[in-house]
């Protein structure tokens, strides 16, 4: 039996559920990247900012868009970069979900736990909780999906203690 098939057999239901939830997180974040790029390409900087704003402390109606071209261009490209980074994080989430589902990868789990955790919690605590971006199902959905995936996944992964390095013999010397 190859190591790929043995690790595939060792992926439990909880890990598959966690991987599915992480994949959903990835799709949500890829959508943000695509929608941000679409808004910027079709309607410019104002539309892109309108996509973000709307929190209790930053209502769309109160936000003053820059009037000079340089500031507007800089802000637009920074916001576009943010959207593309979010989309790239979504692709990372999809890749990690696949690795968990197919390979029972503890490495993928820990990358999701730490890297995606930093990404989502930075967004939550620097944008949503201060009231800059609206607190709604879309903005809280990502952190909730991440938390569910992190809580559920380990229960379906093989014991981390039972894993041996590739090429290690199971017969004692």
Model-found features: residue ranges?
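Topology signature of small-to-medium multi-pass alpha-helical membrane proteins
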Residues: 2-173
